Amino acid sequence: MKLPFIFLITLLIFVSSCTSILINESSDEERTYSFSPTTSPFDPRSLNQELKIGRIGYCFDCARACMRRGKYIRTCSFERKLCRCSISGIK
């Protein structure tokens, strides 16, 4: 009974010490990130296009939600994530 218990405790100590060594080594590394506009894959035009698509998609979903309620769309603000429908219904 004592032998499996001692083996288990020894194994846990070994695993925990290896884990702490690996964590310390990975946190001690210095990570430097450089930004060079000439080599960067970042394209502001594509980001702008994605934002336009997101805005159109959000307002489209807003309009669909208002129409499901039988109302007109009153306000759609992508930046504030605001979607308001009109008070009066569709005639």
Curated annotation (Swiss-Prot):
Signal peptide range in chain numbering: 1-20
Region PRK6 binding, annotated ranges: 68-88
Name of the protein this chain belongs to: Protein LURE 1.3
Biological function: Pollen tube attractants guiding pollen tubes to the ovular micropyle. Attracts pollen tubes from both A.thaliana and A.lyrata.
Subunit structure: Binds to PRK6 LRRs.
GO biological process: pollen tube guidance
Species classification: Eukaryota, Viridiplantae, Streptophyta, Embryophyta, Tracheophyta
Gene behind the chain: LURE1.3
Location(s) in or outside the cell: Secreted
Family annotation (InterPro entries): DEFL_AtLURE1-like
GO cellular component, one term: extracellular region
Keywords on record: Disulfide bond, Glycoprotein, Secreted, Signal
Cystines in this chain: C59-C76, C62-C83, C66-C85
Glycosylation sites: N24
Family note: Belongs to the DEFL family.
Tissues of expression: Expressed in the pistil. Detected exclusively in the synergid cells.
Major site of localization recorded for this protein: secreted
Keyword Secreted: yes
Superkingdom of the source species: Eukaryota
